[in-house]
Amino acid sequence: MPEGSKEAGSPARKRPAPQEEARRHSAAHRVEYALARTLESAVSALPERAADGVGRRIGRTIHRLGIRRKVVEENLRLAFPEQSAEWIHRTSIAAYEHLGREAAAILRLSKLDRQAIIDRTVPVGWDEMEEALSHGKGVMLVTGHYGNWEIAAATVASRGIPIAAIVRRQGNRLVDERLNGLRARLGVEVITQREAPSRVPRLLRKNAVIGIVGDQDARRAGVFVPFFGRPASTHRGPAVFALKLGAPVFACVARRLPGAAVRYEVSGHGVPVVRTGDLEADTTALTAALAARLEAEIRKAPEQYFWFHRRWKTSPPAEQPSSETGTVEAVSAPADPDPDYA
């Protein structure tokens, strides 16, 4: 969908006057935004492979500085207890390098158009998705922080299929608006979390694809399902939408392919939706199935997952934190009223 386009029937939004615009953003946010745009310009000016190399080196430097390194290594130990300390260390470095490369790829989105996305992606399961869309109920496309999730959404849009992504708003609204503008330029419509309950049903009725990144810790509001053999608080939103609205569900990832070229395999496969009449049980079952699909993909290339997030931060209600291992942390915060899908 072109940048600035609006859903049919929605009221036009008046852009704030310059003085009002300035008051909306703090000085710190304006400086942060200026730095981000400078970095974007610098990376975009480089040839793609050079930008990829710069991102990789930046990631490795951040690893050496130790930023969130303990979190990454602890997550890897929890997910792969059978692996050696050497493997954990090596995979940790590779995860930082991957993060740097994909950050550079996202900064270069302004350089890409529809054909550039097509040239960089290899779709898998496309016929399956087109068949699902032929029934006119839209598709729920659920992914995780693996590979490059922005490319996953852009791949759908580049093939001429309307897609809207449910996103979490960034704290810096200037950065948020810039990122959303880049998404819109590639044909990806944006839905904020608070807009989702009203907009998702309308878009599904128009046979659109709804993209959700749903693998972060959901605190007390989540449903606990196995993830790498451990109960993880997971957002129930994707499953609830699918069960209540009757849309087919696809598990999707955009995995970076090996080699010097920047290319991705974007796979999407249907996940069976079982309706027994017990919404809570069905929600848990579907959420668990989606988590299992994501885990299977992560095992193919563990370094491409976002291990920087404390995925097992919240303990199940009946589970007490272990003071000996330190692997489970109790959280006393109330349920999150604004779940984080992105």
Feature-to-residue mapping (PLM):
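A conditional alpha-helix N-cap/helix-loop micro-motif detector
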Residues: 119-123, 146, 172, 190-193, ...
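Catalytic core of membrane glycerolipid acyltransferases/transacylases, capturing the structured
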Residues: 134-194, 217-223, 256
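Membrane-anchoring hydrophobic helices of lipid-metabolizing enzymes
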Residues: 2-143, 176-179, 187, 331, ...
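Non-catalytic C-terminal accessory region of glycerolipid acyltransferases
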Residues: 2-27, 38, 46, 58, ...
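Short amphipathic alpha-helical segments and helix-helix/interface helices
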Residues: 129-130, 153, 179-180, 200-201, ...
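Short, flexible loop segments at the rims of nucleotide/cofactor-binding pockets, characterized by
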Residues: 116-121, 168, 185-191, 228-229, ...
